[in-house]
């Protein structure tokens, strides 16, 4: 900018150059540019700064609890650890911007390259080398490691080797002890065979190859995986727990390593002690030159965590063959004749799948030798193996029956299916193993699944890094892996032991329970889709089912409905019954009247005019609801209705869960802790009918959007008719009773059920208007406030009156994502955290989605709704 003088012409200001030495530039004087040191600095007796390019390290990004980056110039980042203000950043204006011939097209390409560079192999950056992948590179920095990100070392290998030589207090093999726990390690069995050590499941002492890092050696309080800092701090532990469990689940061909729960408490046998002595010296010698092994282990562990965190948020394309449900159904009904075991097989007890990918931990079930004296004539006849059920197995089964099964339903039930159907079949598996030496793959899968659910539930009750938390976590990983292997065998291979339909169905549904408890819901969609095809194949072969089977169908139907409400992008063409056609131009209004009785439109929202009844669809085995147009007092549970109102979509089954019993007897007046089996999920039948029809409407609407089809007129009219039913709905359940003071709730449980029902109803209104009508959330804040009030009232009953009720997270999630008020958002956040403490699972995925919706809405970013986040993260949501 020019400077004007009073008397003379304007003088042009000197242009600033950026070619001088750093000292002259700092003094803002002209530099003579002499190399290697300028003459002006020498004359001034100043050290010349030279002409080299100066780079400055950028500070790591920090995020607030909502995942929003904190600006570098904020007070939280402008001071260093010593309290002084950091120097300003230099700008390299004398260096041209880099221009590449090839630019990135997708962010995923850049993320993949940066992920590889984040954990470089040691040989790529050794000897001051720089590893470059296309546009980015990495080199080795300081040797000082930040200990908060490094895995904790529990013991020194040299000390272990010396102690092995001096005493026999530490075992190198798996012991038949009830205090051992299994953790997976890769490629161990082959190494042991090659070196001649086949007795144990642990790496031999003189094997110099580093094992896969221990899954649980990390300090969970300080762990921060690069690239996933946006995960909320309150949910990071649960996310990492899911990643750890996923790591244990996806390890292929693993051989468990037995680790003692109580250190220094094992006693080794003489043979094991000799083996330890033989290999102790070699073990110590190998450690002399293995200083890089801990770094490799940490690097490998970081990479595993990143890979599995990526699996949590992105789709996992499996290369395994999909099972054929029809072939399995044929096998179920063909192999119904009694089996007989040859005498040669009586000594064999099958506790693990034959593929050796997993095994039953010896701390629960163990094979022992029969030591009783027998007559010589019976030595070759009587089996020589026994099955010992340790106290840990009984403890886990007892914990499941008393503490976990009741939380699978919204309210405590007198006849809980998880106690009357699931649990007895797990005990049958134990009986088969003890009596016959083997059980069906489905029962084995169910037994391991129930034990895994108990372990995951128990580990959530202990603080992070606590010994028992790691113990039950590792045990649950192994049991979940084994349950998955048994189920895979059940679905893909034919066994000599016949499978029963209810056994297979409970095994598949139990895997869904594990996914909810252990935190990730990635496999729920696959398990429910498999279950759907399996049930349909069964109904084609034999449509008549028992009451127990119908109960399992009800459980599946409701879980599938909950899953379908969020997995809208997974809609299948067979679900669509209303397609656009040429008849739309001449379309007449849909006649919803009942042709068999009268021409008046049925008012299904008025309970005095009829009864909502359960009906079984013989084509796909799902449960749907019929509205019987007769007074409740004149209709018995088993009578044939004279007129019915079918679901809104007559060609598909509207899923529900309900029993054929009088609605007026739903809430027991005498016992406030026990509710009838009609109310597994604490919702009236008419509300589930509305929920099912609403989900079908939303899925139809999404199918039209995905396939670029015009919306049929018939569908628009059906939607309007449903909207009227939704807004006029009234519950058929009687929550109140008349007394001298007016109306009051029957009991505390009835009051809690009322709040649960109304919170779900108002959330259903929010779900319909946001997903089917694309209404802005600002117009629904009245319903959001009502949902929050009912949830808080229900929570108050649980805390003060000890009402046994575990609400669904569905209504809180839908209302929370639609909430725009920051104070109410914090209330929803607190409610979800409280539900995670009292319920079965942590629901960290749904809670993180809710936080992301609020962040986008606050920053005025596009896609500030749960469905956009669901699609962006490719994350499955199971809100049961």
From Swiss-Prot:
Descriptive protein name: Arginine metabolism regulation protein II
Source organism, top-level taxon: Eukaryota
GO terms under cellular component: cytoplasm; nucleus; RNA polymerase II transcription regulator complex
InterPro entries found in the cross-reference section: Fun_TF, OAF3, Zn2-C6_fun-type_DNA-bd_sf, Zn2Cys6_DnaBD
Entry annotated with the keyword Kinase: no
Main location: cytoplasm
Entry's Gene Ontology BP terms: arginine metabolic process; positive regulation of transcription by RNA polymerase II; regulation of arginine metabolic process
Paired cysteines (S-S): none
Subcellular location: Cytoplasm; Nucleus
Summary of subunit composition and partner proteins: Interacts with ARG80 and MCM1.
Keyword line: Activator, Arginine metabolism, Cytoplasm, DNA-binding, Metal-binding, Nucleus, Transcription, Transcription regulation, Zinc
A GO MF term: transcription coregulator activity
SMART domains found in the cross-reference section: GAL4
PROSITE patterns on file: ZN2_CY6_FUNGAL_1, ZN2_CY6_FUNGAL_2
Annotated DNA-binding residue span(s): 21-48
Pfam family, any one: Fungal_trans_2
Function comment: With ARG80, ARG82 and MCM1, coordinates the expression of arginine anabolic and catabolic genes in response to arginine.
